[in-house]
Amino acid sequence: ELADELRHVSLSGGKRVRPTVTVLACETAGGSPEDAVDFGVGIELVHNASLVVDDIIDQSEVRRGTAAAWSEYGYGPAIVASDGLLGEAFALFSSDPQAMQIVSEAMVELGEGEATELAAQPTNEHEYMELARRKTGALFRAAAELGAVAADADAYTVEALGEYAERVGVAFQIRDDVLDATADADDLGKPTGQDAEMDRPSVVQVTDLTPAEANERAKTEANAALDALSTVDGGNTDAGEYLEDLARFVVVRER
């Protein structure tokens, strides 16, 4: 049954943005995509594990157009599935101490972000941006840094790609908040209006920004990501160009 639960969570679709970042970062840093596959799978499993918990906290019954794990199997089995995903993920990172450190630090940031969202909600734009960095940016950063590590990149390249991805992650979260407030649930593949219904901090709820102004903030983050990427030697490769495209895409996506 646990295997069914793991398959339900990990094979139910999704954008697979984080593993894509891992593979592209590896190529941009001079590595082969094959070198980054394990790390890419691992970071997606970590992300999926966090979504299981998110859905329990939010009481969201739908994820990626299908039943959320807790809705399908119950709270206990869903939590066990989340633990199982993390176990599988760390098995993929365990051969590389640097990878273990990167992911562990990202998970601490992610946990702090979730705790902040529940217990000490942000009250202004600055606090919101810090929440977005922890809640979403940290795992994006880890995805890119893992790719750079897989390519045996130097510390400067690891940091530059990490900065790029963290900024993309923040832009992604801002756009996610805007979509929650403005998109159609069927188009988005998950319930909308959740932030307002649950009094959950979002860029729309916390600040006085209109959706259009929030989108501009997302574009500012995307531009900062592009600036960071421009300092990487491999930024003009095909993989680097795909990373550029991603930074531009996350702020205009519709789901």
What name fits each language-model region?
Residues 1-255:
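All-alpha prenyltransferase/terpene-synthase fold signal
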